Every structure is written in structure tokens, then in C-alpha cells.
Amino acid sequence: MAAAGRLEDSSLDILQSMDDDPLLDTQPLPHHSLQAQFRPRFHPLPTVIIANLLLLIHVVFVVLAFLTGVPCLYPNPTEDKCPENYTSPLKVQTAIILGKLILWILHLLFERYVQYHHRKVRSRGYSQIYRSTRHLKTLALTIHSSGNTALLLLLCVQHSFPEPSKLYLELILAVLALELICSLSCLILYIVKIRRFNRAKPLPDVLEEEKIYAYPSNTASETGFRTVSSLEEIVEKQEDIIVYLKRHNALLSKRLLELATQPART
């Protein structure tokens, strides 16, 4: 009987302490408000427009290079200049090389721009699109850098062996054409991937995996099964998840404090 009395007294003390707790006096937050505040907002990647513009600039440059260089391949060019002097006072090769340098700088700026936005997407929890375009978003710049190396090699050889001048111009135009084909393939593939990502408007990878595990259809049932193939990918994926969860928890804490102070303001 004494033990039962002590148990009843302790339960009454707990209930009284809960009633006296000021944190529990606040009104419960409405479910629809929490759902609206904590639902992750999708931010599309804005790199598609810049990629399309750069693709157009590249095509225009190569077309102008051919329109300027092909007349110089006709018989009797005067001192490696076109008869019409399209690029006067510069030589044709000089104008093409300068245009190629400007195009490379644009690709360098584009690569930095893409890296910046992809890092932001990765911090929001979309590590899958970051990994799937890791090499693709830098491949166009690598192709242009390789083209610059080939052009530099041609200019060095031409400096030592100036004749025949037509052959070097033909090789320069061939390098530009090959570079255009490879670069366009990379940019088009990148644009298609990013457009699909923007149209799909997926949830962060953590929430997408929760949906898959909540409604398993074709997933393997073995314990410890992972779809990634290497330990490095597993560690990188876990790192991305931890960074996203830390950022998400900080955002949730901030919004909870804002919602909790709203009844007091009113």
C-alpha cells in the first residue's frame, strides 16, 4: 500500500511539473503550416540558357572561320592574306587564333559558372545530378584546351617550316571542325541532362530514397544491399547526406523558432 501511494504521488508530481512547464503552454503548431514551411523548395539549375548561348557562339565562330579561311585556300593567295582582305590588317590565321582564344575564355568562365551552381545544388541534397555530370561539365573545356594545344603545335611547326602555308590553314580549320563536333556533343548531352532534371523537379536524394524504401518495388531485399558499386562512392554519398541533413536541421530549427514566436506576437 505504501509503495502504491508513493507511485501515485510521483505520477501526480510529474503531471504537475508538466502543467507548470512554460514550454508546454504554447499552442501546438498547425500541421498545414509546418508542411508548408518544411517542404523542400526546388531550385532549377540556371545553366541551360548559358550553355545554349555558348553553343550558338561556338557554331557562329566556326562558320565565320570557314567563311574567312576557305577563300584563302584558293590559288595565288598573297602573303597568306585573302584577296578580299576580310581580316585586314590581321592575317587570317591571326584572326582565327584570336577568336579561338576568346572562345576558350568564354568556356573557362562557363565552367566556373557551372561549378558554382552545381556545388549549390549538391549542398541542397541533389548529389546524384552532381555526380552524374561531374566529368561532363568540364569535358568541353578540356576539349578546347586540347584544341589550343594542337593549334599551338601547328603554329610552332609553321614558324620553323613556313611552307606550304595552305596546309597549315587547312589543318587549323580541321582542328576547329573536330573541336566543334566534340564540344557540341558534350554541351548537348549536358543540356539534355539538366533539362530533364529541371522538368522532373525531384526531391532531395535523401527524401527520394525514403520514398523508394517506403514503397519497395524492385529493390533488393538482402540486408546491407547497396546500389553503388565502390566504397569511395558510398563514402561520398554519406558525406553528401550528412552535409544536407546538417543544413536541413539548421533550417528547420530556424523556422521552428519563427513559428513558435508567431502566437506570442499576435
Curated annotation (Swiss-Prot):
Q: Where in the cell is it found?
A: Lysosome membrane; Late endosome
Point out residues bearing the modification Phosphotyrosine.
Y213
Q: Which residues lie on this side of the membrane: Cytoplasmic?
A: 1-46, 111-137, 193-266
Q: Which GO terms describe its molecular function?
A: protein homodimerization activity
In the bilayer, the protein is annotated as:
Multi-pass membrane protein
Q: Which UniProt keywords apply?
A: Endosome, Lysosome, Membrane, Phosphoprotein, Transmembrane, Transmembrane helix
In terms of Pfam families, this protein maps to:
TMEM192 (PF14802)
> In the record, which positions carry Phosphoserine?
S17, S229, S230
Q: Which residues cross the membrane?
A: 47-67, 90-110, 138-158, 172-192
* Domain of life of the source: Eukaryota
GO annotation, cellular component aspect: late endosome; lysosomal membrane; lysosome; nucleoplasm; perinuclear region of cytoplasm
- Membrane topology, Lumenal segments: 68-89, 159-171
Q: What family is it from? A: Belongs to the TMEM192 family.
Its subunit composition reads: Homodimer.
Give the protein name, as stated in the record: Transmembrane protein 192
